[in-house]
Amino acid sequence: MGTVTRGTTGPDRLRRVERWLAGTQARRLRAAADPLVVDLGYGARPVTVTDLQRWLRRVRPDVRVVGLEVSPERVAAARAALAGVPGAPVFAVGGFELAVPGGGDPVLVRAFNVLRQYDEGEVAAAWELLRSRLAPGGLLVEGTCDELGRRSTWVALEAGGPVSLTLSVRLGGLPQPSAVAERLPKALIHRNVPGEGVHDLLRAADDAWARAAPEGTFGARQRWLATCRALRRDWPVLDGPARWRLGELTVAWGAVAPRARGRAVRHDPAHGAGNRAGGRAGSGG
């Protein structure tokens, strides 16, 4: 179930979300009875799957990473490329139903640059199906990035629904935070208009960035830190300086969820994916 993507990929393209998973979500992987992780729609080459495995092995050496693609040709090519490599990921034909060889429910699922080609109205059903396949305590990250992985965003979803939105950018050369807008997840990219939460967030971030211009004397990182500190006064920011220094900002989903009939569609779990303790404990690599 699913549609073949364009397949664009490259080494370290998804490093930002990999670093986030290995940092803020390490507890989920460590606690899993079966450390199964799925990289859905990995593209024309298997490099992002092996990149993900490398990051997660730092957390859980026995992690079991499976790359799923709806294209049999891509699966065959991945298997051939890594034939004979000890401990290589497993590759199989599959889509949103997450049918992995040998069975099992994944504790982590990454679906990057997959839903971007779908209609916005199809996102909720895809999310629901993917979430239904998660192991207890599992997490789905669904997002997108640019061709070089310098600007990226993703939604984190638990079994009950979406819990957070993360923006992650290369700070060097960043004109303003809203430059990431063209890489918003499909659920939000058409919502960057007045009256929507994500538009308000990006506008507030740009305003805070402008006010923090004097901090730029000490570098873009210090300016970003000042921007995040300012945003935390009025927005439900879930992470802290340890993650901000990496060019990240995570906010509660309820603040940016698409609005319907004048009200936001929200999900407010007791323990979100981007809790502050988890954020501060994350990888600084």
Language-model-detected regions and their locations in the chain:
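Class I SAM-dependent methyltransferase Rossmann-like catalytic core
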Residues: 1-35, 39, 44-46
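Class I SAM-dependent methyltransferase SAM/SAH-binding core
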Residues: 43-99
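A short acidic, Gly/Pro-enriched loop at the edge of an enzyme's catalytic core
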Residues: 97-109
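A short SAM/SAH-binding and catalytic strip from SAM-dependent methyltransferases
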Residues: 106-124
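A short glycine-rich, Lys/Arg-flanked "PGG" loop and its adjoining helix->strand segment in the class I
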Residues: 124-136
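Conserved beta-strand signature within the Rossmann-like core of class I S-adenosyl-L-methionine
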Residues: 134-148
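A conserved mid-domain beta-alpha-beta active-site/ligand-binding segment of alpha/beta enzyme cores
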Residues: 149-226
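Conserved Class I S-adenosyl-L-methionine
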Residues: 198-274
